[in-house]
Each structure stands twice: as C-alpha cells, then as structure tokens.
C-alpha cells in the first residue's frame, strides 16, 4: 500500500471502472490514459467478476498505476487488503464501516455511499473518525448502476455537500455537460464511469472533465 496523503484534492476527478465499457480499449489502457488526463483516484468496480479474477485485475492495475494515484476497490475489502491496494469504497448494504476499517487498517482510504440526510447524520454520529470521504448520489439517473436509489439532483447534492463534515464526492450520471454544475454545489470531487470509460479518448475526456472544476 502506498502512503498517499489522504487529501480531499485526491477526490477531484474520481474514476470508477467498468470492464464492459472499457473492453475495446482495455481496462488498464483506459485507466492509464485517464490518469494522464487528470484523474486523481481510481476505484476498481466489477460486480460480475469472481473474487479470484478481481484479485488478479487489482494486482495488475496496481502494478500499472505504480503509485501515481490512489487505487481503491468497490465493496471487496478483503481483496483490497490482500492485494495491498490503497483502500476501498463500501455501500450502505455492505460490510460495516467499523469492520472495513479494521480489515484495511488506519492508513487506507475508506469511503461510504450516502443517499439521504439521515444516512449522513448517522455517519457523522457513528463513523466520523473511521471514514475519509462520503460518496453522494446518485445525482442523476445512470445506466451503469441498475439498482441505484432515487436520484438526489443538484439541489439534494448541494444540501448534502454543505451538511457533510467529511470530504464529498458526487456520483451518478455525471458527464461533460453537467460536471461544472455538479462542482458548483460545493462537493470536493466528481466520480464518473461512462464519461471516461466509454469515451473514444479517455485522456481527453478526463482533461475536459477536470477543466470544469
């Protein structure tokens, strides 16, 4: 695990991978091009891969990124620990925050998905010292996560961002057309999937997104 400084700046342009969308260009090639374009953190997410396949991908991606930006994994905290990744992101229905932190250790990144003010308040009350950031959303409807909750919209995002004590990352349906509006709500960063993974030129896509900040 690399000792990345856990600054909110690392959340500025947060790439969540989608193996299917990256298939033509290659997952690793897409990620490296996106980092060249300004991506500041990468989350490996593949809901369909086996744990063995995901571990292999995690190790290959970690070697390719070579510490340039933090690499975290979605949900699979044990794989993050085993592959010595920089951390993990978990949802409301996954492993508890306390369990995840115990597995990952103090130095790792740990983020949690938040969809409502009640969830945020509960997080402040119970997990404030265990988390590094919260993911707020979905902001807009998105095709890359079929089971997502009701979109919170820009107004909901603004409310949650202002209420959060922790650094915030907005996620869900964010692209070049709305990135500036999302950044203007006060969140520390935006998380994107298809806006980069489905782009013909991931480097240029990342450059265009970070320019909206």
Swiss-Prot record:
Pathway annotation from the record: Cofactor biosynthesis; thiamine diphosphate biosynthesis; thiamine phosphate from 4-amino-2-methyl-5-diphosphomethylpyrimidine and 4-methyl-5-(2-phosphoethyl)-thiazole: step 1/1
Binding-site residues for 2-[(2R,5Z)-2-carboxy-4-methylthiazol-5(2H)-ylidene]ethyl phosphate, renumbered to this chain: 142-144, 173, 193-194
EC code: 2.5.1.3
Disulfide bond sites: none
Magnesium as UniProt keyword: yes
Cofactor binding: number and manner: Binds 1 Mg(2+) ion per subunit.
Cofactors: Mg(2+)
GO molecular function, one term: magnesium ion binding
The entry's keywords: Magnesium, Metal-binding, Thiamine biosynthesis, Transferase
Catalytic activity reported: 2-[(2R,5Z)-2-carboxy-4-methylthiazol-5(2H)-ylidene]ethyl phosphate + 4-amino-2-methyl-5-(diphosphooxymethyl)pyrimidine + 2 H(+) = thiamine phosphate + CO2 + diphosphate; 2-(2-carboxy-4-methylthiazol-5-yl)ethyl phosphate + 4-amino-2-methyl-5-(diphosphooxymethyl)pyrimidine + 2 H(+) = thiamine phosphate + CO2 + diphosphate; 4-methyl-5-(2-phosphooxyethyl)-thiazole + 4-amino-2-methyl-5-(diphosphooxymethyl)pyrimidine + H(+) = thiamine phosphate + diphosphate
Protein residues bound to Mg(2+): 75, 94
Pfam family, one: TMP-TENI
GO cellular-component term (any): cytoplasm
The keyword Lipoprotein belongs to this UniProt entry's keyword annotation: no
Binding residues annotated for 4-amino-2-methyl-5-(diphosphooxymethyl)pyrimidine, in chain numbering: 43-47, 74, 113, 145
One record GO biological process: thiamine diphosphate biosynthetic process
InterPro entries assigned to the protein according to its UniProt record, in alphabetical order: Aldolase_TIM, ThiamineP_synth_sf, ThiamineP_synth_TenI, TMP_synthase
Family: Belongs to the thiamine-phosphate synthase family.
Function: Condenses 4-methyl-5-(beta-hydroxyethyl)thiazole monophosphate (THZ-P) and 2-methyl-4-amino-5-hydroxymethyl pyrimidine pyrophosphate (HMP-PP) to form thiamine monophosphate (TMP).
Record's protein name: Thiamine-phosphate synthase
Organism from which the protein derives: Psychrobacter sp. (strain PRwf-1)
Name of the gene encoding the protein in the UniProt record: thiE
């Amino acid at each position: 695990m690399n000792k990345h400084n856990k600054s909110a700046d690392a959340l500025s342009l947060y790439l969540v991978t989608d193996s299917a969308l990256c298939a033509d260009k290659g997952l690793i090639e897409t990620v490296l091009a996106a980092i060249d374009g300004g991506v500041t953190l990468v989350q490996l997410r593949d809901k369909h891969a086996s744990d063995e396949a995901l571990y292999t991908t995690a190790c290959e991606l970690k070697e390719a990124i070579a510490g340039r930006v933090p690499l975290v994994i979605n949900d699979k905290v044990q794989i993050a620990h085993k592959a010595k990744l920089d951390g993990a992101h978990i949802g409301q229905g996954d492993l508890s925050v306390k369990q995840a932190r115990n597995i990952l250790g103090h130095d790792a990144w740990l983020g949690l998905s938040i969809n409502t003010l009640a969830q945020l308040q509960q997080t402040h009350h119970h997990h404030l010292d265990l988390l590094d950031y919260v993911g707020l959303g979905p902001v807009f409807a998105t095709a890359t996560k079929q089971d997502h909750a009701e979109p919170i919209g820009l107004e909901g995002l603004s409310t949650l961002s202002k209420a959060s004590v922790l650094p915030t990352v907005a996620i869900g349906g964010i692209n070049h057309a709305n990135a500036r509006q999302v950044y203007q709500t006060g969140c520390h960063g935006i998380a994107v999937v298809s806006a980069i993974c489905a782009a013909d030129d991931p480097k240029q896509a990342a450059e265009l997104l970070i320019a909206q900040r």
